């Protein structure tokens, strides 16, 4: 099955991938803007999960045409992913924390809570390679949400156990995003690549 990057590339789009350090929300926004500054045309900014908070903060960049939230947090001013998630907790097990303040999904719960619609071997590899998220990033608050000024598109993953699907629906309704809903786990970008690519292409029009 083709992934979303392969589909977009085949359809003539150029794809750049940000590798945020996940040390703080400000650091991750800065890393994203660094990549955006290298673009030479209108850009669709896509974020999954915590990445939604990043694109909310980085989306004021002049290159950004629209935003796509893929089972992602979409904070308003003063909100963090911690405050949003705490208000409507997901069905999955609580995150674990390292001694130095980085959060991760218990590998034993990863398949069920993050990627239930993927093969076990693939989910287990993802569990072993997950990038830990600092508490500082999880508690960083939005200051000037880009979705208030630019068109936004969003995917609700109806079987999500990492973000409450009802929270996804309420955030996207609040922002008046163009929404699709897929019967998927939190790893919707992997289990439904064609649908995700189609929404990104729609956002690029």
Place the predicted regions along the sequence by residue:
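Conserved serine/cysteine hydrolase catalytic core
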Residues: 28, 132-194, 198
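Active-site loop/turn elements of alpha/beta-hydrolase fold enzymes
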Residues: 20-22, 72, 184
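Flexible "cap/lid" loop of the alpha/beta hydrolase fold
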Residues: 60-107, 134-141, 163
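Gly/Ala-rich beta-loop-alpha elbow adjacent to hydrolase catalytic centers
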Residues: 46-51, 55
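Conserved alpha/beta-hydrolase catalytic His-Asp/Glu region
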Residues: 102-146
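Active-site catalytic motif of lipid deacylating hydrolases and related acyltransferases
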Residues: 1-41
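Glycine-rich phosphate-binding loop signature in dinucleotide/nucleotide-binding domains
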Residues: 38-41, 148, 203-205
């Amino acid at each position: 099955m083709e992934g979303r990057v392969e589909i977009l590339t085949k359809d003539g789009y150029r794809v750049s991938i940000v590798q945020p350090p996940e040390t703080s929300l400000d650091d991750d926004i800065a890393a994203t803007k660094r990549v955006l500054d290298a673009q030479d045309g209108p850009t669709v900014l896509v974020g999954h999960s915590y990445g939604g908070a990043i694109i909310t903060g980085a989306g004021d960049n002049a290159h950004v045409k629209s935003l796509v939230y893929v089972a992602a947090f979409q904070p308003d001013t003063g909100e963090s992913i911690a405050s949003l998630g705490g208000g409507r907790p997901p069905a999955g097990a609580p995150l674990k924390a390292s001694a130095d303040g980085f959060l991760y999904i218990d590998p034993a719960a990863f398949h069920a809570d993050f990627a239930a619609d993927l093969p076990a071997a693939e989910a287990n590899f993802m569990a072993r390679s997950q990038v830990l998220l600092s508490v500082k990033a999880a508690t960083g608050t939005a200051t000037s949400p880009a979705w208030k000024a630019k068109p936004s598109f969003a995917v609700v993953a109806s079987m999500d156990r990492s973000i409450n699907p009802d929270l996804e629906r309420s955030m996207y309704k609040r922002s008046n995003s163009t929404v699709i809903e897929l019967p998927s786990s939190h790893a919707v970008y992997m289990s439904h690549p064609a649908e995700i690519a189609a929404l990104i292409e729609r956002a690029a029009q």
